[in-house]
């Protein structure tokens, strides 16, 4: 099976692709041209075209089948949307292949897929749960170790987990490309693979590939605390710190109805301002709660102020969850409340205001949730970029998120500075240019 090496594709000079996608692809192809190179890491910010990069990465690299591993169902669906043979097919819409006959055969791995179907596929994608494990239906128990030549790990910060290690160990002969938008892990484990390309968030902000970002914190009330240790007494933050830690304070603030309502009111204010400035764009608030019960309370508080609310969490039945996503896509919601469900892979470009009602300890988790509002709204839909693609992150001043935000603030500041980029030269470009110059020289002699 030599589809990925024999099919003519339009990638390096393709004006429909984004510069970070092309630059990353060039680095991928050059890296794996050395047989000694087996494992690489590419960092591409959310909203920059990671799914598109995954779709072009195998060309000129893979000698046979490709396996794409995703961490969960939502991320898997994002990959599937890119690769479906429908009107949204990436290879056709972005002029990657020159004929619909050249589209690769793509299959989602399911327990009931036939062996014949697997063998005829060029690309197989699945969430990690269906690939690893002791179940007879797991992919590693159905195909030989050399079935794939190239494995692409989406959301690579999960790769150090045991289930991922098991899959990569089984297919150890394959080349491995890790792709992530957030190169941080909360458990201090290093993401595998040699970093061969990293596009800074500031660069894609400057190019307007993603929304700009800004932060606004609220602290409308003077904070007082109560505790059973000292009943009937209002305690200041300084009083509490004498016998409680900072984490206790941050959790208390996150779960406080009064503090939550401060964030709710500010997020609604910003939504109203946004809709007044750009009434045709269905902007929405993404609110992130601590738990399902907390999310239900947030929903009641938002609804009490006249907003339409959709809740998404992992305990919902599939049918209810599908209805919830449909309501979001059909703009039957002003507020989407999530409990660790939308953190990866869900792309809805109209999520423009992020209201955070919980503390974070992991920079990866914080980066994931901020990434959900990064996707830019297309130019043909907006009033102005600085209005519609200017994401707002809102949280309480005392919830402990300011240190997390500093990472993004540095990127925001860098994005405001104009940088003249150096040219990127490849060996292929050099050879082509050399031939061109020779022909020019030859023409001059004839004259």
Predicted feature residues:
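Walker A/P-loop
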Residues: 34-57
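Conserved Walker A/P-loop ATP-binding site and its immediately adjacent core
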Residues: 56, 60-93, 290-293
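Inter-Walker segment of RecA-like/P-loop motor cores
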Residues: 89-135
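SF2 helicase catalytic motif II
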Residues: 128-131, 141-178, 182-183
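Interdomain helical connector at the RecA1-RecA2 junction of SF1/SF2 helicase-like NTPases
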Residues: 188-280
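Long, largely alpha-helical accessory region at the distal end of helicase-like NTP-driven motors
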Residues: 253-255, 259-262, 266, 270, ...
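Conserved helicase motor "Helicase C" RecA-like lobe of SF1/SF2 P-loop NTPases
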Residues: 290-313
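Conserved RecA-like P-loop NTPase helicase motor core
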Residues: 308-420
